[in-house]
Amino acid sequence: MNTLLVGINVAVMLILVGVLYYMQRKHVSFNKRVFTALGVGIIFGLILQFIYEPTSKVIIESNTWFGLIGNGYVKLLQMIVMPLILVSIISAFTKLQLTKNLGKISGLIIGILILTTGIAAAVGIAASAGFDVSATGLQQGDAESARLKLVEERFTSIEKTTIPDKLLELLPTNPFLDLTGARPTSTISVVIFAAFIGIAFIGVKRKYPEQAELFKKMLDAVYAIVMRMVTLILRLTPYGVLALMAKTVAGSDINAILKLGNFVLASYVALIVMFVIHLLLIALSGLNPIQYLKKVFPVLTFAFTSRSSAGAMPLNIEAQKEKLGISEGIANFAASFGVSIGQNGCAGIYPAMLAMMVAPTVGIDPLQPQFILTLIAVVAISSFGVAGVGGGATFAALIVLSTMNLPIGIVALVISVEPLIDMGRTALNVSGSMTAGLISSKWLGELDQDTYNQDDTKTGEIAS
C-alpha cells in the first residue's frame, strides 16, 4: 500500500514539473516560474502534511524521490562552484579588472562582511533578550541524544583549534584538494590560489607577453564553457525549488516546531531585522533598496529553499553582474568570500542567540555589557572559515560556545527546528554577500547604475 501511495505522490510531483516545463516553453519569465514553483511546492507539501504524518514511511520515501530533483539540482550547483570561482577570479586579472584595487576590494568586502556579522550578533542578542528565549525546559529525546553525540565528536576535532590556527587554515596547502571542497575553508583557499595565479599572470605579461596572451586565450575559452554550464544548470532552478520546498514542508514536524515556537519566532524576527539593516546600508550608500530587493529575490528564494549558500553562489554571481550592475571581479570576490566569511545568519545571529540562551544555566548574566561585547567580538572573529553548506551554523556555534566557555549541548537540543531556521539563515547569508558586493562596488565607483536602476524580469541568459 505504501508503495502505491509513494508512487502517487511522485506522479503528482512529475505532473507539477511538467507544468513548469510547459510554462518555460510558453516563455513565461524566469522569476515568475521560480515564484510559482515556490508557492506550488509549499501547497503540495502542506497537502502531504495533512494526509500523512511527517514521520510516516510514505513521506520519508516520497521525500527520497523528491530529493532526486531537489538535492540533485543542489549538487549540480555545488559541482560548478569551484570551477566558477577559479576561472572567474583569474579572468578578472587577465581583463585588468582587479590589478589596481585588489587590496582595497578584498579589504572592503571582508570588512563589510565582518562588520555586518557583528551587527547580526547584536541583533541576535537583542532578539533573545526581547523574547526571553531560554534553554531552561528543553527536553532531550532520541533525536537530540543522537545529535548531541555527533556534536561532541565534532567539538573534539575543533576544541584545540586557536584563532591563529583558523586563519592559517585559510591558506591553501594543496589547491587540488581544495578544488574538491574537502575542507570548510576550501572556498577561500581557492580564491587565494586563483588570486596568486592572477598576480603571476600580470608579472608574466610584463616580461613574456606572448606566453601571457596564449594563457589568456586558453582561459577565455574555459571561462566561456564554464559560464555556459552555469547557465544550463540555473535554468533548472524552478524544478529544484519546487522539489526542495515540497520536501521541506512535507517533512517538517509541526508539534516540535510549536514546542520551540518562541525560539523560532525570535530567530525569524532577528533575521528580518538584519535583512532590513542590509536595505538601510544600501540606502545609505545612495541606492534604491527596493530595486535591490526586487532583483535579488529569486536568488534569496533559492537560498531559502536549498539551505546552501555555496549552492546559491552561481545565482548570486549572475544576479550581481547582470541585475545589480556590479563589476565581474567584485561580484566574484563578494560571492566567494561570502560563502566562508561573515555569514550574517549562520555565523552571526545563530551562535549569538544560543550563547544568550545557555549562559544563565552556568550562572552568567547574559545582559552584562562585558559579556555582550565579548560575545559580539568572538562571533565576528569566529565567522572566518564557516562552510557555506549544511552544518556551517553548527560549526560556528561550537566555536563561539567553546571560546566563551559555555556548554555545547544546546546545539543538539534545537535540532527539531534546525531545518526551518536554517532556511532563513541561508537567505540572510546570501543577502549579506550581495550587499557587501553592491556597497563595495558603489564606494569604489565601479557600479553600473544604469543596470541597477533598470527594471527587468530576466537574469542574463537564464530565462531564455
From Swiss-Prot:
GO molecular function: L-cystine transmembrane transporter activity; symporter activity
GO cellular component term, pick one: plasma membrane
Keywords: Amino-acid transport, Membrane, Transmembrane, Transmembrane helix, Transport
Transmembrane segments: 3-23, 34-54, 73-93, 107-127, 184-204, 225-245, 263-283, 347-367, 371-391, 395-415
Matching InterPro entries: Na-dicarboxylate_symporter (IPR001991), Na:dicarbo_symporter_sf (IPR036458)
Location in or out of the cell: Membrane
Disulfide bonds: none
Pfam families assigned to the protein according to its UniProt record, in alphabetical order: SDF
Main location: membrane
Membrane-topology descriptor: Multi-pass membrane protein
Family of the protein in this entry: Belongs to the dicarboxylate/amino acid:cation symporter (DAACS) (TC 2.A.23) family.
Entry function: Mediates uptake of L-cystine, the oxidized form of L-cysteine.
Protein name, UniProt field: L-cystine uptake protein TcyP
Annotated organism of origin: Bacillus cereus (strain ATCC 10987 / NRS 248)
